[in-house]
């Protein structure tokens, strides 16, 4: 069921919403992993939000990658992302005032990138 918009709260829109989502995802990653990405870009297209993060690896993870342990780092990143799922969804729902129906995460080692994808419940049509 689609959330009802709450007009009493000023919610960010447009570029401000994109920036707010990027900031909250970076902050959550920093709190949970000890270091946040150095770059983040959020794109919103109707019911899909994609956050692309750059330079995400901690120094410990980079040390392991440099010694051919990329798979172990990717496994650990998947565990972090699964553990952060609830917090990420709650943050995006609070910022957009919409329900997240699906959340997906992926990481890439070289180049050092991550993507967080949020699928939103479609907005209810405006009353006529």
Segments from the language model and where they lie:
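Interaction-mediating elements
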Residues: 1-128
């Amino acid at each position: 069921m689609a959330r009802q918009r709450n007009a009493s709260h000023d919610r960010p829109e447009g570029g401000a919403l994109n920036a707010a989502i990027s900031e909250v995802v970076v902050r959550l990653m920093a709190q949970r992993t000890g270091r946040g990405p150095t770059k983040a870009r959020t794109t919103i297209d109707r019911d899909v939000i994609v956050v692309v993060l750059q330079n995400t690896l901690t120094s410990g993870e980079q040390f392991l990658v440099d010694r051919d342990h990329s798979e172990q780092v990717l496994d650990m990143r998947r565990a972090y992302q699964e553990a952060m799922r609830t917090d990420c969804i709650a943050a995006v729902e609070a910022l957009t005032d919409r329900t997240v129906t699906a959340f997906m995460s992926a990481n890439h080692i070289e180049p050092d990138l991550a993507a967080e994808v949020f699928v939103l419940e479609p907005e209810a049509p405006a009353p006529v």
